Amino acid sequence: MAIVLGPNQYGKAENRVVRTQRDTPRHEIRDINVSSALRGDFSAAHLEGDQSAVLPTDTQKNTAYAYAKEQGLTSIEDYGLALARHYVDDVEPVQGARIEIEEFAWERVSIDGVEHDHTWVRRGQEVRLAAVTVEGTADAQQTWVTGGLKDLVILKSTGSEFHGFLTDPYTTLVPTTDRVMATSLVATWHYSSLDVDWEAAYAGVKNVLVRTFAEVHSLALQQTLFQMGKRVLEAYGFIAEVRLSAPNKHHFLYDLGRFGLENANEVFHADDRPYGLIQASVLRDDAPAAGPAWDAYTGLV
Amino acid sequence: MAIVLGPNQYGKAENRVVRTQRDTPRHEIRDINVSSALRGDFSAAHLEGDQSAVLPTDTQKNTAYAYAKEQGLTSIEDYGLALARHYVDDVEPVQGARIEIEEFAWERVSIDGVEHDHTWVRRGQEVRLAAVTVEGTADAQQTWVTGGLKDLVILKSTGSEFHGFLTDPYTTLVPTTDRVMATSLVATWHYSSLDVDWEAAYAGVKNVLVRTFAEVHSLALQQTLFQMGKRVLEAYGFIAEVRLSAPNKHHFLYDLGRFGLENANEVFHADDRPYGLIQASVLRDDAPAAGPAWDAYTGLV
Amino acid sequence: MAIVLGPNQYGKAENRVVRTQRDTPRHEIRDINVSSALRGDFSAAHLEGDQSAVLPTDTQKNTAYAYAKEQGLTSIEDYGLALARHYVDDVEPVQGARIEIEEFAWERVSIDGVEHDHTWVRRGQEVRLAAVTVEGTADAQQTWVTGGLKDLVILKSTGSEFHGFLTDPYTTLVPTTDRVMATSLVATWHYSSLDVDWEAAYAGVKNVLVRTFAEVHSLALQQTLFQMGKRVLEAYGFIAEVRLSAPNKHHFLYDLGRFGLENANEVFHADDRPYGLIQASVLRDDAPAAGPAWDAYTGLV
Amino acid sequence: MAIVLGPNQYGKAENRVVRTQRDTPRHEIRDINVSSALRGDFSAAHLEGDQSAVLPTDTQKNTAYAYAKEQGLTSIEDYGLALARHYVDDVEPVQGARIEIEEFAWERVSIDGVEHDHTWVRRGQEVRLAAVTVEGTADAQQTWVTGGLKDLVILKSTGSEFHGFLTDPYTTLVPTTDRVMATSLVATWHYSSLDVDWEAAYAGVKNVLVRTFAEVHSLALQQTLFQMGKRVLEAYGFIAEVRLSAPNKHHFLYDLGRFGLENANEVFHADDRPYGLIQASVLRDDAPAAGPAWDAYTGLV
């Protein structure tokens, strides 16, 4: 029996790159948190402390900022592809690279209906996600791209039921035909093509997710999530799979009867913990294997 | 020499009250985090453990939820006034009450341009604040109301200079005539009247703050903040004082010259810590004394 | 082509269970955050909103608290095993269960060298982790247990070098033979046996990890991590694999030469982001397959 | 009526200074988060954007690191005093300076009972606090120093009652003669002398606070807090006032009777929000005026 090195990766996490474009008086801005991880044979570093195959994480930091200039930053998927391919193609010991990106959206300030050229307010709503994985070189090169979002907090004040569930001796929940349903959605999706208008795809997927949450009369959060994933796949042929993780942000009806007050689903306590947590994948039955598409580095995607 | 009890207060912090209105198919929602603190002679509780003058914090929790039904929750200032007056007027040992509220805004989901009746997405931008303090009863009763906001992240990519500053042997900063200026603004303001349309006032003040940040060509964050406060006071005669606390969220130009790349204010590192922190009050020279308007309980306001 | 439901699980996350033992005047306390996830054929809930196979997450909450009484809570691994087996053995539709636990340690208050019977201070150092996965019933039942820790912040002020690394056009890092090395360690390990003294094993593994970090003269964080994992495996035959995730918490030497001051590795800026992030597995070459041991539900392990 | 500038201050917040001493093989380490604020007539900066009186916050950052070398960092109070006096004495426009410090404690790693020379684990328990305010120069100079701690989580599993409280129509709380009492203590104290052994004083005050929490049979958190403050004042003649802020971290008895289980104060749900929050000052009746001792800049103290 011997003790051996197993799977490993290393990189620079959470580079906070802000990129403006100022070729004209009307500036543009992109604001991201990017992490890069390199995979390959780094056993000498682990076993002997020999760094000769190790490109420093400091270099990866420099590269993240330099590529925001050299390659531009007009969509996080393209930027991530450029970075991942660079490491695999240009740095000899690197056999695979994983780039994970969070993007924070800004909205242009409007003054009397006119958009300001160079001032923005952070939108603050959901965080956009992307992850790019590239493995191998030349003809053997394979690429996986996922998009996503997190922290999209969405709520409906009716149109949600929960009853008919399995019971056991520990079950005390009262069935309901009308409840508040709310979640802080995490959704990621695997693109089966690289020939995608990333900006339009992101906006479109978000729109389908939100719209479906609103439109589906819900018998369970599970049912709503499946419909959300299904409708994304129906709308976008270049998406192979959608993964959803949805905490059930409980809104408990507050017992006001003790004070002689009726509470017809009007006053709730929004509780923190514990919370229900539903996770599901929705995919095409002919979807290509996900491979390392969802093998996370920092937990972003 | 004796050891004595000094100023004290107690209450229930961070009640997460969500209130819907569902009288018609088009529902409404308000989502708040409310804290109540009571002030008065509670020395028996401290000195002898005698609770006979102490209304439990659990009761304050119940009251926060009950008042969302009884009094409604159509503006946080009115709701806060109702709660504060209740404690001072109805609970004998209470001589003063402080209500602090954070409000989280939701925006209605739109489907094909039509607003949905009962589904919303958390806006996620700034958090609205209010604090109400009531002291004394009947003719001796005094009331202070402050409004505010926090977490409003705003940035301009040009139109900001910083030079001509004082130097000493520890000064290494390079003057600049063009930099990114960004902050996560906290602003609070003291209403000198209670006869205010709170919703309109909040929207208006936020608009003035954002607009002024955009419009003022900045020679220093201090200068921008003073103008922001000044224009709020000019626009709203019923506001006596504005207090601003603004972290300078540094965006450092990344040195790309090392890689043969020009960086003409295009690529920045958004740093976390440390950060400059500027705080200032702007007020009318005939402003009434602020009294306990800003004597915080939970640090919300 | 059809759209189908892929892998899914659901449960109640972050139940904050505190269990005291008070059979004698000297009380004991265990303080945990426990999440349970159920796996099985829940397609009816997703596809049709039919809950008849779904044990509510509310029931899982009740069960977490009830089992702290019924089964006791003397080690998180045994408690997790009892919960996981209960779901798989007693709830018919459940084919697999995953229990993830964080434990917060308390230390007894000492007064004049005498330990107090019923007062503790939260230790506050690392958080202990465990995850139990059970699949199948009767003879086909399989069980995986991992232990772990997170948030163990450890630093050495010398005995760490970093040089001889690969360079490319983006490399600007200066090699060093003496630097501060610090991390906030996450380590998890897979037990190949269930016949383990869990409390002793945890204390022992933590001790080996800390001791090895101190004793190894480091040429790279990678090398230190491999040694940490290797020595755990050498010391504990019932551990098959160790996984380590270590952010390099950078301590940058502050340039005091600008002020005529020498800085011989004495004054550092502890930076927040970005950070190097090294991840590695160390295992026996005859280790059993990890199976779902590390298939996380909440990201705890 | 004119609009004028009110009270203002500015500085550099949250400088993360780490200072090692390595004169001998046995190193020492101090790890702090320090903020400095300057007060004076900075109206030209606010009103006209004229920075000629403004020492940049970047300079304050440099100074914080430089002083960790020049003045050393053997106690945060002495380091804070040196910084504050420097700004007031050496920088002409500065009339007052406020230095706020958080300190994170490290404990030396022990290997087989022998302390390691240069490896530590972050203790992780409470955060130590200090704030220094200096106003005026030469004979007119006044100085205030407060010490403190935060995040000290302490719990007793019995020895706490709560009954006999005031009731009103919203009161539903059940009185109890035996409950868990827990808090995450914030305590700050005002030193009436500068001739203090700061390290011994801090350790002593913490010890009195913890011991008193344990020893007092509690009829209310208020009563416990008053005793904690009183005993600190009795023990340390050079402390004039103690301020305590204590969230009541509720541990709710879980209703296990529904499952046929007895719960004799053994199984609790540790709730997050809302929480009771008790704040009180305990002082000598001849205490000097606190002046600006507690006028916070960053909310640290």
Where are these regions (language model features)?
Chain A
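N-terminal intrinsically disordered, cationic/polar leader segments
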Residues: M1-V301
